[in-house]
């Protein structure tokens, strides 16, 4: 199984966001662009928490994505930017996992 690639550069984030293909929920903003491989960038806005907590939330999201990846629910060829909203942060890990799974199901439905 391949490793999940990550988006790191600001211009890569902006290129995906400027395409304006998005799924918006109460918990996440999810921008996506078709690609030859799966790649994801995670952003937690600076005003929501200090750096330690932002990194903690990013690790939780990455872990949930890794579980989805291992279960085979993420096999799409998209570049994705995931922006967490404030009410997503205090949720339990299981709830975060379910919200991410729901978004990827919607993305799969939008692909067709």
Curated annotation (Swiss-Prot):
One of its GO terms (molecular function) is ribonuclease P activity. GO terms for cellular component: ribonuclease P complex. Its EC number is 3.1.26.5. SUPFAM superfamilies: Ribosomal protein S5 domain 2-like. One of its GO terms (biological process) is tRNA 5'-leader removal. The keyword tRNA processing applies. It catalyses: Endonucleolytic cleavage of RNA, removing 5'-extranucleotides from tRNA precursor. It holds the Pfam family Ribonuclease_P. Keywords: Endonuclease, Hydrolase, Nuclease, RNA-binding, tRNA processing. It is an enzyme of class 3 (hydrolase). The keyword Membrane does not apply. InterPro entries: Ribosomal_Su5_D2-typ_SF (IPR020568), Ribsml_uS5_D2-typ_fold_subgr (IPR014721), RNase_P (IPR000100). Gene3D superfamilies: 3.30.230.10. RNaseP catalyzes the removal of the 5'-leader sequence from pre-tRNA to produce the mature 5'-terminus. It can also cleave other RNA substrates such as 4.5S RNA. The protein component plays an auxiliary but essential role in vivo by binding to the 5'-leader sequence and broadening the substrate specificity of the ribozyme. Belongs to the RnpA family. Consists of a catalytic RNA component (M1 or rnpB) and a protein subunit. This is Ribonuclease P protein component. The gene is rnpA.
